[in-house]
């Protein structure tokens, strides 16, 4: 399980 890097 890879967590998407979506932090804005």
Swiss-Prot record:
GO cellular component: extracellular region
Localization per Swiss-Prot or TrEMBL: Secreted
Coiled coil: none
The UniProt record lists the keyword Secreted: yes
Residues of the signal peptide: none
Pyrrolidone carboxylic acid: residues carrying this PTM: 1
Entry comment describing in which tissues the protein is expressed: Expressed by the venom gland.
Superkingdom of the source species: Eukaryota
UniProt keywords, alphabetically: Pyrrolidone carboxylic acid, Secreted
Family classification: Belongs to the tachykinin family.
Name of the protein: Tachykinin-like peptide-II
